[in-house]
C-alpha cells in the first residue's frame, strides 16, 4: 500500500499524494518546469539548489536514471513533485528508478498530486515556500513554519568547486568560473578542443590572468545574483583583457558588473521549450532555461551593454553584448541538457572571438 504524503504551501493550501524518494523531509521555494523530457538532467542541475521542482509533464521517470546523464555529481534540490512517477522504467541504459535515485540523495518527493493546479497557483501568485509532511495533523504547524522560514542564501558557495581542476583539451585554454556549472558546458568546450580549467566562484581577476587563458566563462548557478557580488570586481578586472562569455547567473553578474540591476521574477523561466529572438538576425531559437531572476532592461540604458536577445513570452532580456569589448552573455542555456541544441552555435562564436582576439594580440606584439 502506498504511503500518504502531503505537499504544503505557505498560503495554507495542501495537496495529498504518495510518498516518493527520501523520508528526510525539507522545505524550499516551489517552482515549476515545463520540459517534457530530461528530468535527470533537471534534477541534477545545481541551479535548482534549495528548490522544490514541480514537473508539469504528467509522467516522470519512464526511462529511468543512469550514471551518465547527471549534470553534477550530487543533486542539491529540496524536493520533487510529479503527477505520476514511473515504477517500471523502460530503457536499456536505465540503472535506477526515480524513487531510488531521490532516496539515494536524500531528496523528498510526492506523486499523485494535481500538478496542473500547483502550476497555476505558482503562475498566478508567484513562487511560494513549500514543504512536505507525512502526518496530516502537522499541516497547520508546517504552514506557520513556512511563513517565517528563511531560505538558504549561500547556494553558490555550496555548489561551487572548492579547488581548481582541469578537463583536458588540445587547443584554446578557457577558465570556467564555477557558480554551479552544468557539466555539459565543459563537454561543449572540450568538444571544440578547449582545455578547461574549472575554478571556484570567488577566484580573483589576478589569479585568472596569471593562468594566461584565451577566454573566460562564467557558468550558471543558483540564487540571487546580488548575493554574489564577490564576482563583480573580478569581471571588471578581466573585461577587455580576455574574451568573456557568461551563461545564466554568469549573464546576470556580467550585467551587474556594468551597472545594471536585476529583479526577482514572479515565477521565472524553467523548461526546455522557451522561444528566444535574436534581435540582430530575427532568428528564433527554442531554448532551455532555468532562472528566477532577470536583468532590468531600463537599467541598461547608461551602460556599455546592448540587448541582443529577448524572450518572446514576456519580452525580458535574454542576451547581452558589450559595445566595444569582446564580451557577451545569454540568460538561457546554450549547452542544453535538457533541451534543444538550437543555441550551441554560441560556443562556436566564443571560439571565434578567442581566436580573433589572440590573432589581434599577436599582430600588436609582432
Curated annotation (Swiss-Prot):
Give any single GO term for biological process. glutamine metabolic process
Q: Which domain of life is it from?
A: Bacteria
Annotated GO MF terms: ATP binding; carbamoyl-phosphate synthase (glutamine-hydrolyzing) activity; glutaminase activity
* Pathway assignment: Amino-acid biosynthesis; L-arginine biosynthesis; carbamoyl phosphate from bicarbonate: step 1/1; Pyrimidine metabolism; UMP biosynthesis via de novo pathway; (S)-dihydroorotate from bicarbonate: step 1/3
Q: Which reaction does it catalyse?
A: hydrogencarbonate + L-glutamine + 2 ATP + H2O = carbamoyl phosphate + L-glutamate + 2 ADP + phosphate + 2 H(+)
Keyword ATP-binding tagged: yes
Instruction: Recite the UniProt keywords alphabetically.
Output: Amino-acid biosynthesis, Arginine biosynthesis, ATP-binding, Glutamine amidotransferase, Ligase, Nucleotide-binding, Pyrimidine biosynthesis
Q: What SMART domains does this protein's entry cite?
A: CPSase_sm_chain
The record, for InterPro entries, names: Anth_synth/Amidotransfase (IPR050472), CarbamoylP_synth_ssu (IPR006274), CarbamoylP_synth_ssu_N (IPR002474), CarbP_synth_ssu_N_sf (IPR036480), Class_I_gatase-like (IPR029062), CPSase_GATase1 (IPR035686), GATASE (IPR017926)
- The catalytic residues are 248 (nucleophile), 333, 335
Query: EC number(s) per UniProt?
Result: 6.3.5.5
Instruction: Report the protein's function.
Output: Small subunit of the glutamine-dependent carbamoyl phosphate synthetase (CPSase). CPSase catalyzes the formation of carbamoyl phosphate from the ammonia moiety of glutamine, carbonate, and phosphate donated by ATP, constituting the first step of 2 biosynthetic pathways, one leading to arginine and/or urea and the other to pyrimidine nucleotides. The small subunit (glutamine amidotransferase) binds and cleaves glutamine to supply the large subunit with the substrate ammonia.
Its subunit composition reads:
Composed of two chains; the small (or glutamine) chain promotes the hydrolysis of glutamine to ammonia, which is used by the large (or ammonia) chain to synthesize carbamoyl phosphate. Tetramer of heterodimers (alpha,beta)4.
Instruction: Spell out the HAMAP family in the cross-references.
Output: CPSase_S_chain
- Name of the protein in question: Carbamoyl phosphate synthase small chain
Q: What taxonomic classification does the UniProt entry list for its organism?
A: Bacteria, Bacillati, Bacillota, Bacilli, Bacillales
Amino acid at each position: 500500500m502506498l504511503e500518504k504524503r502531503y505537499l504544503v504551501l505557505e498560503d495554507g493550501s495542501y495537496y495529498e499524494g504518495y510518498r516518493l524518494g527520501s523520508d528526510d523531509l525539507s522545505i524550499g521555494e516551489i517552482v515549476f518546469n515545463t520540459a517534457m523530457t530530461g528530468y535527470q538532467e533537471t534534477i541534477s542541475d545545481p541551479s535548482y539548489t534549495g528548490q522544490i521542482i514541480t514537473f508539469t509533464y504528467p509522467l516522470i521517470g519512464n526511462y529511468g536514471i543512469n550514471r551518465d546523464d547527471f549534470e553534477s555529481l550530487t543533486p542539491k534540490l529540496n524536493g520533487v513533485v510529479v503527477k505520476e512517477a514511473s515504477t517500471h522504467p523502460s530503457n536499456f541504459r536505465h540503472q535506477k528508478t526515480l524513487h531510488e535515485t531521490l532516496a539515494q540523495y536524500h531528496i523528498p518527493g510526492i506523486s499523485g498530486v494535481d500538478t496542473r493546479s500547483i502550476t497555476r497557483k505558482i503562475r498566478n501568485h508567484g513562487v511560494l515556500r513549500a514543504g512536505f509532511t507525512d502526518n496530516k495533523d502537522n499541516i497547520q504547524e508546517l504552514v506557520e513554519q513556512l511563513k517565517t522560514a528563511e531560505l538558504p542564501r549561500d547556494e553558490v558557495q555550496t555548489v561551487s568547486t572548492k579547488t581548481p581542476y582541469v578537463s583536458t583539451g588540445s587547443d584554446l585554454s578557457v577558465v570556467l568560473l564555477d557558480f554551479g556549472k552544468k557539466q555539459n558546458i565543459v563537454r561543449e568546450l572540450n568538444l571544440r578542443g578547449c582545455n578547461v580549467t574549472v575554478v571556484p566562484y570567488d577566484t580573483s581577476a589576478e589569479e585568472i590572468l596569471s593562468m594566461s587563458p584565451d577566454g573566460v566563462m562564467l557558468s550558471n548557478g543558483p540564487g540571487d545574483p546580488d548575493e554574489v557580488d564577490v564576482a563583480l570586481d573580478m569581471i571588471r578586472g578581466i573585461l577587455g583583457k580576455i574574451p568573456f562569455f557568461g551563461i545564466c547567473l554568469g549573464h546576470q553578474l556580467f550585467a551587474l558588473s556594468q551597472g545594471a540591476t536585476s529583479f526577482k521574477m514572479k515565477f521565472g523561466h524553467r523548461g526546455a521549450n522557451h522561444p528566444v529572438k535574436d534581435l540582430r538576425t530575427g532568428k528564433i531559437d527554442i531554448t532551455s532555461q532555468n532562472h528566477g531572476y532577470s536583468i532590468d532592461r531600463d537599467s541598461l540604458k547608461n551602460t556599455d551593454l546592448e540587448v541582443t536577445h529577448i524572450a518572446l513570452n514576456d519580452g525580458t532580456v535574454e542576451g547581452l553584448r558589450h559595445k566595444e569589448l569582446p564580451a557577451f552573455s545569454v540568460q538561457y542555456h546554450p549547452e542544453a541538457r535538457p533541451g534543444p541544441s538550437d543555441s550551441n552555435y554560441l560556443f562556436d562564436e566564443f571560439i571565434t572571438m578567442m581566436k580573433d582576439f589572440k590573432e589581434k594580440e599577436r599582430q600588436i606584439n609582432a
